[in-house]
């Protein structure tokens, strides 16, 4: 809905190939944007660069009435691969975005995890870096069914309210869910939860490092780990009761030595005991 508020139907939103809005929303962004499209920007470790963004921007919006016009840029942090945009990287993306007269959206489903990992403030990671709107996550950090939309332009914020109502996202008694956001933000609870999740991930990373049968696919920078390991190791872990997603192949059949990628996520409630239990399974 934020993107729909920022995008005209004949425009295109610039995002990375693995962006949630491209891979995991059942075409909802295109639907709510009235048919606007997504243009994929080349990424490294799930992050676009100023250079790759500029290239994508130059390839769109130059065909007059025959092609899509340039629309907002959308980035995600923590990214879908567990990496983080530094403040300098956000500012650099914003500079290119503003050079083309466009708006910058930040998908912050794990905003808190990225912020505490950087040691930044909410303002430093948003409007001070040139971000125009933030999808501020709650459900990935302890809330139940609650997210917040933070829009720094009052005119766009009012349009968002209308779009929320029209999209049936303003429903009766929702205040009983929305009330969580007050408690979430009060006294820094949201940052405490994120620090706990990141710290637990650090313990898990330390336990995985040094094994010659495991390699990190991406540098773990917050609370998500992608690790590459032989199929046989995944089979042993899952068979012993570990629960996690395995990507890029069938874990149940194939070469035991074939390398598959596992995805591990630590939340605010993860305990050292649970991590030790997983590492014990790993040790056999």
Kindly label every feature range from the protein language model:
Residues 1-240, 248-270, 274-284:
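Conserved PLP-enzyme active-site core in the AAT-like
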Residues 244:
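FAD-binding core/adjacent interface of flavoenzyme oxidoreductases
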């Amino acid at each position: 809905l934020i993107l729909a508020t920022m995008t005209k139907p004949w425009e295109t939103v610039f995002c990375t190939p693995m962006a949630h809005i491209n891979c995991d929303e059942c075409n909802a962004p295109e639907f709510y944007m009235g048919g606007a499209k997504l243009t994929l920007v080349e990424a490294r470790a799930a992050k676009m660069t100023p250079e790759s963004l500029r290239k994508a921007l130059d390839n769109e919006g130059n065909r007059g009435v025959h092609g899509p016009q340039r629309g907002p840029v959308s980035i995600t942090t923590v990214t879908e691969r567990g990496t983080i945009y530094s403040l300098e990287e956000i500012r650099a993306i914003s500079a290119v975005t503003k050079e083309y007269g466009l708006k910058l959206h930040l998908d912050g489903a794990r905003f808190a995890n990225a912020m505490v990992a950087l040691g930044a403030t909410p303002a430093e990671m948003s409007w001070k870096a040139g971000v125009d709107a933030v999808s501020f996550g709650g459900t990935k950090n302890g809330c139940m069914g609650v997210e917040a939309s933070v829009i720094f332009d009052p005119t766009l914020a009012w349009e968002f309210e209308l779009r929320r109502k029209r999209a049936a996202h303003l429903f009766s008694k929702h205040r009983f869910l929305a009330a969580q956001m007050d408690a979430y933000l009060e006294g820094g609870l949201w940052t405490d939860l994120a620090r706990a999740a990141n710290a637990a991930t650090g313990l898990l990373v330390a336990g995985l490092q040094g094994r010659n049968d495991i390699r990190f696919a991406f540098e773990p920078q917050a609370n998500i780990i992608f690790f590459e390991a032989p199929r046989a190791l995944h089979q042993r872990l899952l068979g012993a009761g570990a629960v996690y997603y395995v990507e890029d192949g069938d874990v149940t059949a194939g070469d035991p030595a074939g390398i598959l990628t596992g995805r591990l996520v630590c939340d605010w409630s993860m305990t050292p005991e649970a991590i030790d239990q997983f590492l014990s399974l790993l040790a056999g």
